[in-house]
Amino acid sequence: MAEGEEKNGIIDSIPLFAKELIAGGVTGGIAKTAVAPLERIKILFQTRRDEFKRIGLVGSINKIGKTEGLMGFYRGNGASVARIVPYAALHYMAYEEYRRWIIFGFPDTTRGPLLDLVAGSFAGGTAVLFTYPLDLVRTKLAYQVVGSAKTQVKAIPVEQIIYRGIVDCFSRTYRESGARGLYRGVAPSLYGIFPYAGLKFYFYEEMKRHVPPEHKQDISLKLVCGSVAGLLGQTLTYPLDVVRRQMQVERLYSAVKEETRRGTMQTLFKIAREEGWKQLFSGLSINYLKVVPSVAIGFTVYDIMKLHLRVPPREEPEAEAVTTRKRKVFT
C-alpha cells in the first residue's frame, strides 16, 4: 500500500506537459513499429522499385521475407522510431500551445473545427521542421534492398550507396550535401503536412460534433472518427508524400539510372508526365491498410499511458473558465 502511494506520489510530481510528452512519444513509437512492414513496402512502391510494384503487396511481403529475412521488414524503422517519438510528442505539444495562443491572443476567436485546422497545421509544420532529417534517413534506409541472385532482386551497388545504419547515413549525407542535404524534400513535406495535419484535426473535430452527448467518451467512436479523418487527410495530400519520397532517394536512384529532379513542382509534373498520374497514388492502398491499425493502436496505447501516468482529462468547462479569465486580463 505504501509502495503504491509512493509510486503515485512520484507520478503526480511529474509536470502535466511532461506526462503528455511521455504518453505521446511512447504511443508514436509503438504505433509506428506495429505498421513498419507496411511502411517499408509503401516506400518501395512510392520510390519506383518496379520489381516490388509488379508483384503487389503479398508478393512483396514474400520477397522481402526470402531475401532479407524478418528484419528486412523493419529496415529503416530505427530512424523512423527515433523520428516519430519526438515528432509525436512535439506535434501534440505544439498543437496545444498554438491552440492556447490563438484562444488567449485572440479572445474573440470562436472555438470549433477551424481553430483545430489552424493549430493542427502549424503544429504539423513545426514538428516536421525539427524532425525532418530523421525522416530523410528513414526513407534512404528503407529504400535500400539487399540483392539476391535466386530471386533476381535489383539492388543498389554496395560500394556506392549502401548505408550501414542511421549514424552512417547521417554522416555521409552531411559530408556529401551539407545541412541542405539533410532537408532534401522538406518543401513537399511542408506542403503536405500543413493541409494533412490541419484537415485531420478538422475532420476529427467536425465528426465529433455530430456524436450524441451520451457517446462523447466512447473510445470506439473516437477511433472511428480518427480513422476516417486520417484516411480523408491522407487521400487529399498523398501525391505530395510521393513527391517527397522520390526527392529523398533521388541520389540513390540516379546511381542506378542517371536522373536528376530538382524542385517540388518539377518533380510532381515529371512523375505525372513520365510515369502517369497513377504513380502519384502508388502505395495509397497500403497506406489505407496502415492508417487504420496505426490509429487504433495509437488511441489504445495513448489512453493506457494517460491512465498509468494519471493524466487528468481535458475538461472544456475548465478551459473555458481559463479563457474567460485571460480575456478579462486582455481587456
UniProtKB/Swiss-Prot annotation:
Record membrane topology: Multi-pass membrane protein
GO BP terms: mitochondrial coenzyme A transmembrane transport
Underlying gene: COAC2
Cellular-component GO terms for this entry: mitochondrial inner membrane; mitochondrion
Keyword Transport: yes
Record-stated family: Belongs to the mitochondrial carrier (TC 2.A.29) family.
Record localization: Mitochondrion inner membrane
Official protein name in the record: Mitochondrial carrier protein CoAc2
One Pfam family from the record: Mito_carr
